[in-house]
Amino acid sequence: MMLQAQDNGAIKELVSRLDLESYKSIIKGLTQFGDRRQGTSRNQKAVDWIEQQLQAFGCSNTKRLAYTYDPEPRPPRRRQSASEPTDLTTPTGGNVGRNGSGPGGSSIFGYRSQTGVNRDLMAQPDERIRELNREEPTNGPRTEVYCTKIGTTRPHEMYILGAHMDGHGVNEAVNDNASGTALVMELARILNSSDVETEISIRFALWNNEETGLNGAYSYVRQRKELQGIENPPGSGEYPEPTWLGMIQHDMMLWDHGAPGPDGKVSRDQRREADINIEFQSNSYFAEASMKLAFRFKAAADAYNTDFPATVGPHMTNTDSTPFMNEVPSISLRENERGA
């Protein structure tokens, strides 16, 4: 089967091969490594496991990108005294908690509540999960894995499908971000089937060190962007880094809880208006092209998705497509919007 643009029959066939049980199985496999926090042996074991799975799916040309994570120590944060008054007003005159500025240039409407990640091992009530995550991270060498479906007619060009495989928080990092990692791996399974060909190359990249500041994705961009479109060895027809046509990130895909209620609590149930949010960054060099890419994904979701509508927003931020957004059209798929 040759997958070409506008070939609705081939697309429908590939969509039908998406398998919920396969997706859940990959997520379950990732949870055996706890939160997969960077700088730990559980993280490195997860990278090894991901590579083995990609090879088993037929994406056998796996590669590792190596880099070093050794940041300067952060200065201690000044803690606000309980007696100091807190300014909760926003530029519109309302109080924080009702309205205010949000990430990626967004505005927040409705109620807000404080969020954060648990770093206290003993705050995790499950003893098994505590033991999985007992090892603390250390700075030093890191690796992340990717593989490539080689295009038949345009092997020198590619789209990058990415997700970060690391997490943190003394948990199993299921939503953030086994959910995105498993989706990219499920796509790798389908698109690397022996009966599937694509005109353009597709790279499946599982980033590391997202939770520490997108370090794995930034390292990829720094190391690989100047290699785009170069045939190596000359005359071989091989392109170790095909020219980037677009970058599509998958980060937190599992459930849409919506905004907190008046009591500041977030519902444990998915909201009735749950959707897929496709984001680009309006303050990026490729904003217009990224917006067009986002709406192409929305059109595809409208045509082939069976459960959830898709919406497009301009506030992409804090995810691994950010390092790419001034190099190539880039979008992020996620469970909920950054803000209005």
Task: Please report, for each region that a protein language model flagged, where it lies by residue.
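Extracytoplasmic/secreted proteins, especially bacterial periplasmic and envelope-associated proteins
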Residues: 9-13, 22-25, 29, 45-53, ...
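Second-shell loop/turn segments in exported
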Residues: 9-18, 31-42, 130-136, 166-178, ...
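Sec/Tat-exported extracytoplasmic proteins
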Residues: 15-22, 27, 31-38, 50, ...
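Structural recognition of the beta-strand scaffold that forms the well-ordered cores
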Residues: 23-31, 61-65, 144-148, 158-162, ...
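A non-catalytic alpha/beta surface segment that caps or lines the substrate-entry region
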Residues: 25-148
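Solvent-exposed loop/turn segments at secondary-structure junctions
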Residues: 35-38, 60-61, 68-71, 152-154, ...
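Alpha-helical metal-binding/catalytic segments enriched in His/Glu/Asp
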Residues: 145-147, 161-218
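Metal-dependent peptidase/peptidase-like ectodomains
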Residues: 207-320, 330
